[in-house]
Amino acid sequence: MSFRPVIISLVVLALAGLALAFAPTGTTARPDQGDARPFQLRDTDGNLVTDTSLRGQVVLLYFGYTFCPDVCPTELGYVARVLRALGDDVERTTPLFVTVDPERDTPELLKGYAPLFHPRIRALTGTPEELAAVFKTFGVTARKVPGAGSHYLMDHSSSITVLDRQGRVAATIGSTDTIARSVTTLRDILGKP
């Protein structure tokens, strides 16, 4: 009797189990496109930033944290490449980095972090309650993964939500898309009234 099919089946089951074990929990469905999303947060200077204050602008929202070891720098680097590829159209966009870790991401830390990727990226924060409301509004999950001592990671959603000039969810982009595809998507949204 050959044990090869049994071994292959066990390996596949083990990999599937690992994938489920490390999958984000408590996921919230992403909101449907087309609806305006009210929210209220603060920038790193303490200024109020709301959905209404951003009307008339095409907004790129990314939720992450400064201590993120891999996904956040990758996605913010992607946002920066897309912004550079937009050329002069970049002036008509507002890229925002919203923290999922207000405990460690102080306004001072955020102020120095976001522009490292691109000078147009502004960081936003808020109280845990304000952030939880924004997470719910945009279907973002974020939870602390305990580590040793004060070291921990955040398990969070990772996509870039694009809002049109009326504050409606118009698209979702991310580093799995080509730069050209995201630029085309943004230019289409920028061209719409």
Task: Tell me what each language-model feature is.
Residues 1-38, 42, 192-193:
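N-terminal targeting signals for export/organelle localization
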Residues 36-37, 59, 157-158:
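Short loop/turn microsegments at loop-to-beta-strand junctions
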Residues 39-59, 83-86:
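A short beta-strand-turn-helix
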Residues 52-75, 79:
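Short active-site neighborhood of thiol/selenol oxidoreductases, capturing the structured segment around
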Residues 60-61, 95, 160:
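Hydrophobic beta-strand anchors of alpha/beta hydrolase catalytic cores
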Residues 74-134:
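Structural microenvironment flanking redox-active thiols in thiol-disulfide oxidoreductases
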Residues 130-185:
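Thiol/disulfide oxidoreductase modules built on the thioredoxin-like
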Residues 185-192:
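C-terminal alpha-helix
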